[in-house]
Amino acid sequence: MQVPSIRVVFLLTAVFCVGVKSDECKTADVVVNVDASDDVSDQDFDKLKRAMLMMVRGLSIDDNQIRLGMVTYGSEVCDSIPLQGDRLDLARTIRYMKKPTGPSKPFKGMGEARRMFSSRGRYNVPHITMNLGGDIVDTEVKDLMDETDKARDEDIKVMAIGLGAKVDRDEIESIAYDRDQAYFMDDEDDLIRKVKEIPDYLCKIIKAKKPKVSGGKKSKPAKKVDNGPAGKSPGFDALKQSDDKSDKAKKVEVKELCDDAEWVDGVGYGSVPTRCEDFVMCQNVSGSLRKTLKSCPFGQYWSKRQTSCVLTEDEDCSDDLCKTMLLPSREYDVSCRAYWKCEKGKSVARCCPSGMAYEPGKGCVLDLDCDEECPPKNDGDDDDDSSDEDDDDEIEYNPNCPLRPIKGHPEKFKQHTGDDNWEDFDCAPGTLFSARDCACSILGTAKKDDKNDDGGDAHKVCEPELYLPFCDDLHDYSGKETHVENEGDAVIIENGKAYFNGRAGLKIPRFSGVPYGKSVFIKMKYKEDEDDDKNKNDDDKKLRMKRDERSRKDYLKAILKRDDRKDKTDDTKGRRIIDRNDIIDDRRGRRKDDRKDGGRDDGKDGRRDDRKDNRLDDIKDKNDEPMTLISNGECDNFELNDCFEKPSIAITTGKKSAGFSVTSSEKDEVDLEIDEDKKGYLWDKEDGPDRNGKDKDRNGDRSDDRRGYYWKKKDKDDNGKDKDKKGDKSDDKKGYYWKKDKDDKNGKDKDKRRDKSDDKKSLDDIVREIERSKGNGKDDNKDDEDDDKKGWKTVSLKISNGHIRGRRDDREDKDVLDGDLKTTFSGFQIGQGASNKNFKGYMDEVYIYFCDPGKEADYDDEDDDDDDDDSDENDKNDDKKDGKKTDDKDKKDRKDGRDDRKDGRDDRKDRRDDRKDDRKGGKDDRKDDRKGGKDDRKDGRDVRDDRDRGDKYDKKDDKDNDRLSDKDDRKDVDDNDKDDDNEKLYKRAMKKCDYVNKNVAKWLDKR
């Protein structure tokens, strides 16, 4: 059972104000061993993880201060976190650590901690192991003591914390570096309460000088071996020192390696702990044991089973750091260009291109001083090479690969297209070509020197790294074929738009660990979904709310129409009294009668309504929380509201605001905010203020808020007196009178005030309204487009050479950033991240540039203008050709017209003769009709009597049929309207996607 996350947040807030006070105690490498065997319940294991999270928050975790690692063990080591200084990464990994199984084997946890210090520990930095567990089984005490003694010899200080009332105090004290470094706690809850004291415990053991007696023997820390620059691991390099330096710890270590060696023909071969790529050779020379450390060839591991070096993919080394390492790559110390890349949990050797070096956390970067060979050549492997210029190509050339590298351009490769033809291709941004893999599998970005530029880049077009118009599912239209993940197809793509339901998002893993450069531009078009989740699935509640609102409005209208009631207002109770008996409660819209009330407590109802209003305000505030549009960090948006990897880019949106958060590589954080209520108002300043400092409208009249009336100064007659305006409401305020403005076509009062424009309208909307007012008639297609544009917003973030600009529609905010944008390893995430609510709504387009596009438009209108110009010229040429044909046709038409007019005169003469004959025959017909009419009227009376009798019986059936037919008609109308809406959406989507396809094709052709 997991502990509620909210309690964790409160505990963290209370604890993390302590910290480490002394500067001497702020630098150390700490590994925590946690006993999570079958003796520990799932609930207690969750409490241990809570304590670890609290400790991560309380310590000064940083790459230059305290680095923390963690090991959980049962019968075997389960999960381990390498030493690192990333607080967010540690918190994320701790929360998702799994509980191991089996009986407790604490010596295995201690051994894993020793290997971690040997491979990743810093030089001249205190190494601390915190052993956290319960009672130790007697059979495991000896093995644990042996590992503890080895840790002391390697100058690792052990802090022991015993949990539970059954722990043996003597055993815990014997494990500790000295008795003062042993602590006892009742249970996991007691550990949580005392976790704030752990920084003091660490400071105490860091300052400890001399170890005391442990296990009946004195154990002195081994002397450190100077192995070169700071930051290198002393574990393996200490074994490489010459035999002249007879260090006791070195001899013990090498002796242990030879004890476990496999002997073949008088030579022993043994593996080296934590170094899968190394082995030791043991030989008996003149009665003494000679030890020689060897390294496997590039990209190979030592296989104890085969007693030889094999490819890393063929050997399952238990000490392979890729089994527990979170980063995708790490340093390989055989060359400045070499590094290990994690693939499917195994390490694979890779080389950076020439002129580049591997830098941990960044990948391959430009380094002209790195001129080492990669793979390095072993002794005796020197063959006759053709020339120095071809060395790099020969090293990275794979004869079984149809692709070849291009010298000086690691971001490109050649592909054989038939015969003797080779064509150049570009790798995906952020990757470099590897001949060994026959693919663009190297993480990094190639950078060219200014000296080698041939001037071609001056006219290079800034191309998007990602362009998602959502026309063909999640197809990237930038030409880079970027893969976009849609887990579970939770994001719905339809009609050229993507719908996010508030619990889904898109992920772009390609941008993980890729340097962004000095310029980044992101642009998105979106529309928020205004439906409330709680009311969306509660149709009955919606119907009740609508019904009550309609009843309240109708009742108030009926009351206002009654002139026999006198309105009174009681300001103290917030009620409007209609007469002596009736009371209207404005909040509920219901009429109350004092005589039937029976002593109703209006104050109590008012308080109840206030509480209801507060709840509604809380729901409204919750709905106004910012939602994430895009980020490049991995965050938890539902539990602790914390980021495991803090994003360096985050764009959020609210109903009236937009936020932009940017973090540089220099740890400079900049936050921009665009708030419609505070920034970016559009004021109409054409009419200045009047003498009283108030804004005048267009006509110079003083506006007022009284139901469409406005103040207008009275006109003067010839004698200087005010004219009487019929129908105007006079007023005795200095020659001004009230005048009601004429209603518009919709029955609404026109607004005469122009002091400032509506802050919800953008400048583009105002311009479009003015243009529509100048046009004649209405354009249905244009109205459809305007309806489709309602609610859509455009947000963009531009970072260029240290300058930041965030914009939403026509409002923007600017600032300055120190350094380049920080690289993250979470990729880009659309619709989620940054510890905010997931986005709920629609997205129309998404652009990501790693350059400065200059203009914010994705594809300029220049292409369309060119097409229009070409079409105009073609139309002119066609008109000239058609002109000659038109003249000949006109002559023929005039001749035919004369013949037609002659025939028309003959036709009119024939029609006059026909009318004469018709009048003569009409007289005879009327006589016959009068005679037959008498008989028909008699028969008609009989028919009416029968029909009346039948209508009495059929009236009920007709009403039922009418109701059914009306219901069917309404259903058909609704279905037709729905089909029309879907057809409109489909047409708009096709129009948009046709435009996108046409312009993208032109852009790719130009590129």
UniProtKB/Swiss-Prot annotation:
Biased composition (Basic and acidic residues): 588-625, 676-781, 877-973
A cellular component annotation (GO) from this entry: extracellular region
Biased composition (Acidic residues): 380-396, 858-876
Matching Pfam families: VWA
Ranges of Polar residues composition bias in the record: 651-664
Tissue: Component of conchiolin, the organic matrix of nacre. Expressed at extremely high levels in the dorsal region of the mantle, which region may be responsible for the nacreous layer formation, but only in trace amounts at the mantle edge, which region may be responsible for the prismatic layer formation.
Signal peptide positions (record): 1-22
Subcellular location: Secreted, Extracellular space, Extracellular matrix
Keywords assigned by UniProt, alphabetized: Disulfide bond, Extracellular matrix, Repeat, Secreted, Signal
Domain of life, per lineage: Eukaryota
Region (Kex2-like proteinase cleavage site): 544-547
Record-annotated VWFA domain positions: 29-202
Biased composition (Basic residues): 212-222
Residues covered by region (Disordered): 212-244, 377-401, 588-634, 651-792, 854-983
Record flagged with keyword Signal: yes
Domain Chitin-binding type-2 residue range list: 255-372
PANTHER family xref list: COLLAGEN ALPHA
Record's subunit section: Heterooligomer; disulfide-linked. Pif97, Pif80, N16 and other proteins form a complex.
Main function: Essential component of the organic matrix for normal growth of the nacreous layer. The complex contributes to the initiation of aragonite crystallization as well as subsequent stacking of aragonite tablets in the nacreous layer.
Miscellaneous comment text of the record: Pif80 and Pif97 are rich in Asp. This amino-acid appears to be common to biomineral-forming organisms.
Protein name per the record: Protein PIF
Species this protein is from: Pinctada fucata
